[in-house]
Structure formats: C-alpha cells, structure tokens
C-alpha cells in the first residue's frame, strides 16, 4: 500500500517555526515528509533537516519524497523521545526549530494489517515500531482485568472501561483474542445498545487507549518535549501538533511550566527559587485548522498546534 500523507496546518506550522534560509530543523515525526518538504523549500538553499520516525514504512516514503533535496536531509529511524541523543550523535549543535506531529498517520489508520483501525479485520498489533515486544494482542490477552480497565479509562476516557475489560477477560477465557474484528465485537457487546448510538464508533476510544499503551505515547511525548527544548538554540522554536485532549494537555502543561517555572509561594513578593523561564508561547491561543482545511482534509478537524520559543538564560517570558 502506497504511503500517502496530507500535512495538517502546513502554513500555520511554517509560520510558528519561522523557517528561514540556512536554518537547521528537526522533524521528530517525519511521516510521509509533507511538513519536512516545506521546511526544506523554505530553508533553501542550504538549510538542513533531520527527520525521525519509528515506522520503517514512513521513513522509506519520506526518503523517496525528500530525495530531491539530497544531502540536506538526514533520516533516522527512532522514536522522537530520543531526539536529543540523535542530535548529539550527529554533532548537530543547536537547532533553529523542532516539529512534533503527534499521533497515528492517515496511512497507518488506512493500512489494515497494522491493526490500528477498527474498520479493518487484522492481527492485533498496533505497534508503530514493529521491533517492540508489546503488541495489542499481548495487552488484551495477558494483562490483568484491572490494568486493562485503567488503560481504557485513562487513555481512552471511556466511561464503560470496567465493563469492556470484564468482557475482554471473559472472551479470552474461551479463545485468544487475535484480531481487531474480534476485539470490536467484544467492545460492542460490552457497551449497552443505547450508548453505542452515541459519539461515533463504539470501539474508537478503546482502540485509542490500547494504541497509546502499546506505544507508550504519552511517556514518549513528555520525554520528547524535554529533549526538543534541550536541542534548540535560544530563539529557536518548538511546534507541536496534537490530535486529542490527552496529548494536548501534556503539551499545554509543559509549555506553561517552561514559561512560569517559579515554585515560590504565591504570596511571596519576590522570587527566591531562582528558576528562570525556559520558553514562552509563540501565539496566545492554540491554532486549529480552518474550515477550508477541514473540508479538504477532515482528519485535520481535531488538530491543535502549539508553539514556543526558547529563551536566553535569565530572559523574562512576556
């Protein structure tokens, strides 16, 4: 299946990153190379881009798409949580901009055999990096009922989490749960008929939760944000695109902590903790897709862009 990728919030992201000729940029989730190609165009003639992705298919597609840019591009197969290690290994110095486009690509959803989609019957996998040992099948067949319920509740924000976990454990006693189709039917049976008619596909939240757990997406995001800030030069920018509230909450809270790290009691007239701001927001509010973009690319509807600029040591956030 050909890898297709429509970059969301493309112009808004380029503005947030303030891409300039000759700059050095890191695309932490290079995917099909849509954002990366635009960064390379805007940073011509000698701007450099390092593209990371843990999905070998995505990296192959990015390599094909970005081939015309020659040695201005370096692609590395790794999770973006290792961005600082990659920068060190490549002797990169400081980057002018870092982009993180979080979540599963359109291609991964559409590629049935990976197990991300509840619309295709496929082996229960859900790994973005297929060298990792934990699969969705391992999770649903081997984890304790309470832990499965916690994952579905916390990562899927699913109110029927306990009931779904109970039905999963009951079903696996009869035979192993090996396909997405089996799991979808179990979820449908667990959710009362009246509730199944609300809020889209009944398996959506559970599939999201299991995918997040299998790939440790939220932990990787927290580590990746810290690594991205570390590799930026003062004045460099970090732009992050998220697609659901759990990810956006982590980004929002992290950016707020960087802007106001002071831990002094609020009634203290002068800061004595010595924790200076690390970054400040590029825009006052998060950026979302326009009506025209949503019409052209419905998956952009849930996208949220936040960006910060790294401050000089001791510089005050505005």
Swiss-Prot record:
InterPro entries, alphabetized: RsmH (IPR002903), SAM-dep_MeTrfase_MraW_recog (IPR023397), SAM-dependent_MTases_sf (IPR029063)
Superkingdom of origin organism: Bacteria
EC code(s) of this entry: 2.1.1.199
UniProt binding sites for S-adenosyl-L-methionine: 33-35, 53, 80, 101, 108
Cell compartment(s), UniProt: Cytoplasm
Xref: Pfam families: Methyltransf_5
Database matches in Gene3D superfamilies: Putative methyltransferase TM0872, insert domain (1.10.150.170), Vaccinia Virus protein VP39 (3.40.50.150)
Gene Ontology CC annotations of this record: cytoplasm
Keywords recorded for this protein, A-Z: Cytoplasm, Methyltransferase, rRNA processing, S-adenosyl-L-methionine, Transferase
Gene Ontology MF term list: rRNA (cytosine-N4-)-methyltransferase activity
Entry similarity comment: Belongs to the methyltransferase superfamily. RsmH family.
NCBIfam families found in the cross-reference section: 16S rRNA (cytosine(1402)-N(4))-methyltransferase RsmH
Function, as annotated: Specifically methylates the N4 position of cytidine in position 1402 (C1402) of 16S rRNA.
Name listed for the protein in its UniProt record: Ribosomal RNA small subunit methyltransferase H
Encoding gene (name): rsmH
